[in-house]
Amino acid sequence: MISYIKTELMKEKRSANFKLGIIVPIIFVLFNIAMVSLMGKSPEGKSYILATSFNWYPFLILPIVLSLLVVNISGKEKSEHIVLQKSKNLSFAKMELAKNIIIVAELLTIIVVSTILMFTFATFFLGERISLSQLIMATICLFIGSLPVVVLSFLIYGLIKKKAILILLNFVLTFPSAVIAVTNNWILFPWSYNLRMLSPVVGVHPNGTFLDTGSELMNMETTYLGLFLSIAVYAVVLTLNLLIKNKRSKCFV
């Protein structure tokens, strides 16, 4: 398994995803600067930069980034490569697992670097006091809450093999997430996990407005449930995807 991971890692060093890892954190900071500049000074006890970082950004930009990460690493495998891999008796399931591990690691790196840059900008340029524990919890939720979309993207792309369709699909499915996130059906819609989990952590409604202290959306139990669901969905869909890859490798001619 280690050899599969090393192979995928070597491919990524020369790929578009390497450039994304550099560009996305910069976009993250510029996006926050633009949004905060438009909104002005944060209300007492609230933070516009937290709202833009952990609500608007996951809603507007992150789904596209996740789609690009997946299609870039999966789209490298052309038909001639698959024939060669089959002739060498390589495991398609292990290759898929290696790709998942690499993308999850890249996603974690992007989110952590973006958060550090945002914290630095907010602290030294905006003079905001952001709770470090709150920031760490929000970062964890954003990362884990993105895992279901990552693994579903791998599954969908493996079935349709169309980059544009996957990107468009993730973009479209993100739009109802803010509405679904405030209903009991949010647990059935992985694209809403981030918005729902982060609401009590950063005090922001899924629609982007600030929450009152007594709001039912401030219940942290929902965050813990979302973390569990995200990991569970990721594990189940990943297992399903690996089984499909394993079956296809046996049937491949």
Where on the chain are the PLM-derived regions?
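Transmembrane helix boundary and interhelical loop/hinge segments in multi-pass membrane proteins
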Residues: L50, S67-K88, F92
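Amphipathic cytosolic juxtamembrane alpha-helices at the membrane-cytosol interface
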Residues: N89-I101
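Terminal transmembrane helical anchor/hairpin motif
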Residues: M39-I49, I167, V172-V253
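Aromatic- and glycine-rich beta-strand/loop motifs that create alpha-glucan
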Residues: M1-P25, K250-F252
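Secretory targeting signals
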Residues: P25-N72, A98-K161, N170, F175-A178, ...
